[in-house]
């Protein structure tokens, strides 16, 4: 039976993020991809003057009921931007629609640059802990890691001991494997710390001159797809970083393309790396 993944996150109709990234990227990895939209937005919330928003929480139990009737099941679950009220439904879906040994991959999307995103209150990190406590892989950035651990956000000046303690403390919340993104010990390098429950390893790229919207969603989607293709945790984490850098380079110089990265043009690179 071919592997099937369910990704649960919002649809921003324009803006190259969330489900509009996850579906094509994971499909390009050769994995059948089902979607469960958590909400629908006209566009993402970074840089636009406004947006529309439609919540889909009430649809989740109805969809699960239909899936159970049709005997629909999944080899993996990958969650992104979701609301506090949706987490209990998501946990039920992960329990009832799972094939044996199904992976739970959680990108705890809620914050960056020391602040929670618009729409999340200070209780949200506590609720997110319920989603990560039985996860196989979690992928917080430094800000999200700090919120999950109830610690102050440290943007720079940290060392390996700090990051490695952070990774182990996150695993102590229940996650089997941890990828901390946005790690840097050198101003010219940016990368990830990868903890497999035993040791912490690192992978770095040259730091790009621009900061781009949607790269976190691209990264998490590549990692999820690569894991389902049988790549190791470090291999998947490294490939995700390389694909993000490739997409940023393909977008560089196009001032009109401020809202995301041209990840579509990086898909041949991703496919080649997986072959």
Q: Can you name each region flagged by the protein language model?
A:
Residues 118-201, 210, 234:
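Conserved phosphate/ATP/ADP-binding segment of small-molecule kinases
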Residues 210-233, 237:
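Short, small-residue alpha-helix embedded
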Residues 234-275:
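Charged C-terminal helix
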């Amino acid at each position: 039976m071919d592997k099937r993944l369910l990704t649960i996150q919002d649809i921003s109709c324009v803006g190259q993020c969330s489900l509009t990234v996850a579906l094509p990227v994971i499909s390009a990895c050769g994995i059948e991809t089902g979607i469960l939209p958590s909400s629908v937005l006209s566009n993402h919330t970074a840089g636009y003057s406004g947006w529309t928003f439609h919540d889909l929480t009430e649809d989740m139990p109805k969809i699960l009921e239909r899936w159970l009737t049709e005997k629909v099941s999944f080899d993996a679950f990958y969650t992104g931007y979701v609301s506090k009220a949706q987490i209990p439904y998501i946990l039920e879906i992960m329990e009832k629609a799972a094939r044996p040994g199904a992976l739970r991959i959680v990108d705890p999307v809620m914050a960056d640059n020391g602040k929670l995103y618009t729409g999340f209150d200070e209780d949200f990190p506590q609720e997110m802990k319920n989603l990560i406590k039985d996860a196989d892989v979690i992928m917080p950035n430094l800000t999200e890691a700090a919120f999950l651990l109830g610690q102050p956000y440290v943007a720079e000046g940290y060392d390996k001991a700090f990051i490695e303690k952070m990774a182990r403390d996150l695993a102590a919340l229940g996650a089997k494997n941890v990828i901390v993104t946005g790690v840097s010990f050198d101003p010219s390098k940016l990368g990830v710390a990868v903890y497999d429950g035993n040791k912490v390893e690192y992978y770095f790229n040259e730091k790009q001159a621009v900061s781009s919207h949607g790269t976190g969603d691209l990264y998490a989607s590549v990692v999820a797809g690569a894991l389902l293709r049988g790549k190791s945790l470090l291999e998947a984490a490294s490939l995700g970083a390389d694909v993000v850098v490739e997409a940023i380079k393909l977008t560089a110089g196009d001032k009109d393309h401020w809202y995301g990265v041209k990840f579509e043009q990086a898909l041949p690179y991703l496919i080649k790396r997986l072959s």
